[in-house]
From Swiss-Prot:
Name this protein carries in UniProt: UPF0761 membrane protein MS0032
Family indicated by similarity: Belongs to the UPF0761 family.
Alphabetically ordered keywords of this record: Cell inner membrane, Cell membrane, Membrane, Transmembrane, Transmembrane helix
Membrane topology recorded in Swiss-Prot or TrEMBL: Multi-pass membrane protein
Length: 287
């Protein structure tokens, strides 16, 4: 039994390595990092503009800012927060042409994410008009669902805080797992819904779990390194936030793509088991 498990694990790692080489995930993460830096302002503008139209999402907006501070760039959250506030204020004085151009940039980022993840599954790209319709729906309805999720999270926090006042420690322990569970759920939905092919949700959940673990541990390790070895501030000075942010976005996308690749490889393992695919054929594509 142990020998069978080890054989399957070796095969899994071999397939994963081949697919990693084929899809050039490191380069893909770099391309997404560049696109993210260009599109982060439009995305922030759209999200908080929609939040401002719904007074019920005021607390959710504050929660989202906290989430961005904690995850967008560990150890540089305060600076990023100031930039976000400035972006939102400046967007209110923009012309219609400027707003349309920023929205176009945001749509292009969503398009690149879609193409990159579909390349991992070697699935065909969707029709352009159909794709843009989906992207626009995500861009407009996405913030509403984000606001609802953060509003629910705020409600849970209030309940748990009440339990804490009563001396019930379970609530505080549950609260510490909420960010991880939200990250896991988000990655699971991305791996299930974005590929233009059928994806087994169990495989997506496994890939998302690995990505969420890497993301969470990476965030803590990155923040610890920046706090313990602050030499980057001496080198870059006032510009230190930029390389920190670029590096963390690069790592974040790499974790997400690794989880997506693992999900796809689990599907390959099923095909190998059924005899519809073999490791030799996978290696030939790598060469």
């Amino acid at each position: 039994m142990r020998r069978v498990v080890m054989t399957q694990l070796k095969l899994l790692f071999a397939v994963f390595y081949c697919r990693f080489q084929q899809n050039k995930l490191t380069q893909a993460a770099g391309a997404l990092t560049y696109s993210t830096m260009l599109a982060i302002v439009p995305l922030v503008m759209v999200v908080f503009a929609i939040f401002s139209a719904f007074p019920m999402f005021n607390e959710a907006a504050a929660e989202l800012k906290t989430f961005i501070f904690d995850n967008f760039s560990p150890s540089a959250g305060d600076t990023v927060g100031q930039y976000i506030d400035e972006f939102v204020v400046n967007s209110k004085s923009m012309s219609a042409v400027g707003i349309i151009s920023l929205i176009a940039v945001a749509l292009l980022l969503i398009n690149q994410i879609d193409r990159t993840i579909n390349d991992i599954w070697n699935s065909k790209n969707r029709n352009f008009i159909f794709s843009m319709t989906i992207y626009w729906t995500l861009l407009t309805l996405g913030p509403i669902f984000i606001g609802m999720s953060f509003a629910i999270n705020t409600y849970i926090r209030s309940i748990i805080a009440f339990e804490g006042d009563l001396g019930l420690p379970f609530g505080l322990k549950l609260l510490s797992f909420v960010p991880f569970l939200l990250t896991w759920l988000s990655f699971s939905l991305i791996y299930t819904l974005v590929p233009n092919t059928k994806v087994n949700f169990r495989y997506a959940a496994v890939g998302a779990l690995v990505a969420a673990i890497f993301f969470t541990l990476g965030k803590k390790a990155f923040a610890w390194y920046m706090a313990t070895f602050p030499s980057y501030q001496l080198i870059y000075g006032a510009m230190a936030t930029l390389p920190i942010t670029l590096l963390w976005i690069q790592l974040s996308w790499l974790f997400i793509l690794l989880g997506a690749q693992l999900t796809a490889v689990l599907g390959d393992m099923r095909l190998i088991k059924s005899g519809d695919l073999n490791l030799t054929a996978i290696k030939e594509k790598t060469e």
